[in-house]
């Protein structure tokens, strides 16, 4: 006689085993109709699964995050159903859920085109519109293997042979004549899977191994209603317009080429943005009392063995050798900073010691994962490490948090999601040490009035951490900032200081990054601003233009005055119509265009126009210089009179 306890604390008793759907129906027909699955004692189960003993139950609907994920997973099965009807010889590999959608890897004897995707999507809609029931059957390992062997599904057979225990009972999900294998749960009926869109295809090696066969990966998105689907597709359309790779080419910021995969060739205008960003960070480092250091970009492998990186991270490290010694090109800056700390005897009076670097790092990312500035092999970290005592941890974390929000607000990021990752099962250090560290991080967030979620068990083995995730104008999440405590690395590299009692103690190390990778952050900003960088960041801040040759000398005088004031200005004296020049520089997203005609020459003024098309009228040149300097120095996100 199971007693079912619901989230509101109410209970329902039954004299026989009941399914999740039975309980939902008992509560009300509306909930039964919306029921996708259940969470029984914290574990997700199918709506058809039986509950045989006392349990805590939550009904999962499409409004829940888990419900949407289940719906997307079932759309992957729907894709399998449709593709097997259209091209029966296709062999199905894996079809998991990903952010905002799903994919399925398939082995098919044709190169899928956009026309094929349209045909496939149409068949998926035809099948989903039948609102058929999805039937789950738990079978023996052998029965599952026989089922897929008979259907010629070699990849499913391989999964069973290599990944699933012979004692297990896999779940087979029947979509009419189509059968797929999954841990589940899945939707009970295809009425939940009406709002989807197939997006693109790509190549993918079986099991991610380039030695295996190349499959075709079909990507799709799915949502619980049409409004959400359309909103997402609109966001994708807007994201495509803002793609930093496209804008980077339009604005001549940088390029990449095959001879240096994942490495950035910065052009003049892109490097101007980089240096301006670097200047801003330097100003903040001075304000928050950091030293700036510079470590070598490669060090002997022996050092990386001491840190544990060689054991755990070697596949991501580039190496080289010279004179019978092997060197690793650094993937991160922390070991180098410990070496600097170790030079000379340190006292507790020297702590906290805040050490920052614009560190040039390299990581051997898979070529298929590289993506413009967002995922590169060579990058610059705005990295810092704070060496302090245990008693100083809270104050230092507090300062890091203030610095994070101070810097993010300059760029206009207002929605920041914060997570605190706590001790994992495998860790170093005593429970007391972890408790104090976690409490210090939580207290620092609370003192700053910052809401956060815990991520239990997600901390590194050497300490808990805070993660800061930015949400941009399209509500995309970018994890950039981290504050990570480290109880391990200083000890591994023999870092110590003389304590108040004249004994040697190991400092606590705080890893702190705010922008993360400078390259990636510039990519994020490019998409956030759609290339319309605020004036202080814009590569060219002002273009001064003549209407006819008679104003050329005046244009050059005005341009020099702006340049002498420290404004990035250039003159456009080309023999082109003024409308053509304005259009060209507007497309280049230059913040201000100053136009000189005979009237401006006579009056000593200048006609001011913004890249958004706003005419500010004719203004005195000195007034323009002063106003522009005020906007630039304040790092305003807004132009004059906005």
Curated annotation (Swiss-Prot):
Gene3D superfamilies with a match to the protein in the record: 3.10.20.30, 3.30.54.20, Anticodon-binding domain (3.40.50.800), Bira Bifunctional Protein, Domain 2 (3.30.930.10), Threonyl-trna Synthetase, Chain A, domain 2 (3.30.980.10)
Keyword ATP-binding assigned: yes
First-level EC class: ligase
Primary localization: cytoplasm
Keyword set, alphabetical order: Aminoacyl-tRNA synthetase, ATP-binding, Cytoplasm, Ligase, Metal-binding, Nucleotide-binding, Protein biosynthesis, RNA-binding, tRNA-binding, Zinc
Localisation: Cytoplasm
TGS domain segment(s): 1-61
Keyword Aminoacyl-tRNA synthetase annotated: yes
Cofactor (UniProt): Zn(2+)
Organism superkingdom: Bacteria
E.C. no: 6.1.1.3
GO terms of biological process kind: threonyl-tRNA aminoacylation
InterPro entries, sorted: aa-tRNA-synt_IIb, aa-tRNA-synth_II, aa-tRNA-synth_II/BPL/LPL, Anticodon-bd, Anticodon-bd_dom_sf, Beta-grasp_dom_sf, TGS, TGS-like
SMART domains: tRNA_SAD
Catalyses which reaction(s): tRNA(Thr) + L-threonine + ATP = L-threonyl-tRNA(Thr) + AMP + diphosphate + H(+)
Positions of the UniProt region annotated as Catalytic: 243-534
SUBUNIT field: Homodimer.
Purpose: Catalyzes the attachment of threonine to tRNA(Thr) in a two-step reaction: L-threonine is first activated by ATP to form Thr-AMP and then transferred to the acceptor end of tRNA(Thr). Also edits incorrectly charged L-seryl-tRNA(Thr).
Name listed for the protein in its UniProt record: Threonine--tRNA ligase
Gene name linked to the record: thrS
């Amino acid at each position: 006689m199971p007693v079912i306890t619901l989230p509101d604390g109410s209970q329902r008793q039954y004299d026989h085993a009941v399914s999740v759907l039975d309980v939902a129906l008992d509560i009300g027909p509306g909930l039964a109709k919306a029921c996708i699955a259940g969470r029984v004692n914290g574990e997700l189960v199918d709506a058809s699964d039986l509950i045989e003993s006392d349990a805590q139950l939550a009904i999962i609907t499409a409004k829940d995050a888990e419900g949407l994920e289940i719906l997307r997973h079932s759309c992957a099965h729907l894709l399998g159903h449709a593709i097997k009807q259209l091209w029966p010889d296709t062999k199905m590999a894996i079809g998991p859920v990903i952010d905002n959608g799903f994919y399925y890897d398939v082995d098919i004897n044709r190169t899928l085109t956009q026309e094929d995707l349209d045909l496939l999507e149409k068949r998926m809609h035809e099948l989903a519109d039948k609102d058929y029931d999805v039937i789950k059957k738990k079978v023996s390992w052998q029965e599952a293997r026989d089922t897929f062997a008979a259907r010629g599904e070699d990849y499913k057979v391989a999964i069973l042979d290599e990944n699933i225990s012979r004692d297990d009972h896999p779940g087979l999900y029947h979509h009419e004549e189509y059968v797929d294998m999954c841990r589940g749960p899945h939707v009970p009926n295809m009425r939940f899977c009406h709002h989807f869109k197939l997006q693109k295809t790509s190549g993918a090696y079986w099991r991610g191994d380039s030695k295996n066969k190349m499959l075709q990966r079909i990507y799709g998105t799915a949502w619980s209603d049409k409004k959400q689907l359309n909103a997402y597709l609109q966001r994708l359309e807007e994201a495509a317009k803002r793609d930093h790779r496209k804008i980077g080419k339009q604005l001549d910021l940088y390029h990449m080429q095959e001879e240096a995969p994942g490495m950035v060739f910065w052009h003049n205008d892109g490097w101007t943005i980089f240096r301006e960003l670097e200047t801003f960070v330097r100003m903040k480092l001075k304000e928050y009392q950091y030293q700036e250091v510079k470590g070598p970009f490669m060090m002997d492998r022996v050092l990386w063995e001491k840190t544990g990186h060689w054991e755990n991270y070697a596949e991501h490290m580039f190496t080289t050798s010279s004179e019978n010694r092997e060197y690793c090109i650094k993937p991160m800056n922390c070991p180098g900073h410990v070496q600097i700390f170790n030079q000379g005897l340190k006292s507790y009076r020297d702590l906290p010691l805040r050490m920052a670097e614009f560190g040039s790092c390299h990581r051997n990312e898979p070529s298929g994962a590289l993506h413009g500035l967002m995922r590169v092999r060579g990058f610059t970290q705005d990295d810092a490490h704070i060496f302090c005592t245990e008693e100083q941890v809270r104050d230092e974390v507090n300062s890091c948090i203030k610095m994070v929000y101070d810097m993010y607000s300059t760029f206009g990021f207002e929605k920041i999601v914060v997570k605190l990752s706590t001790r994992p099962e495998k860790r170093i250090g005593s429970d007391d040490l972890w408790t104090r560290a976690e409490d210090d991080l939580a207290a620092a967030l609370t003192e700053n009035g910052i809401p956060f979620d815990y991520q239990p068990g997600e901390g590194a083995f050497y300490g808990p951490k805070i993660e800061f995730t930015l949400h941009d104008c399209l509500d995309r999440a970018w994890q950039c900032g981290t504050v990570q405590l480290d109880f391990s690395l200083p000890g591994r590299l023999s870092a110590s200081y003389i304590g108040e009692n004249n004994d040697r103690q190991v400092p606590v190390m705080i890893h702190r990054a705010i922008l993360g990778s400078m390259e990636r952050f510039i990519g994020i900003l490019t998409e956030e601003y759609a290339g319309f960088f605020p004036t202080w960041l814009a590569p060219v801040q002002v273009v001064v233009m003549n209407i006819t040759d008679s104003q050329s000398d005046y244009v050059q005088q005005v341009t020099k005055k702006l340049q002498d004031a420290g404004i990035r200005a250039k003159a456009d004296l080309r023999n082109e119509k003024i409308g053509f020049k304005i259009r060209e520089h507007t497309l280049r997203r230059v913040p201000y265009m100053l136009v000189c005609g005979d009237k401006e020459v006579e009056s000593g003024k200048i006609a001011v126009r913004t890249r958004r098309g706003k005419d500010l009228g004719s203004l005195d040149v000195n007034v323009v210089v002063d106003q522009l300097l005020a906007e630039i120095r304040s790092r305003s996100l807004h132009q004059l009179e906005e």
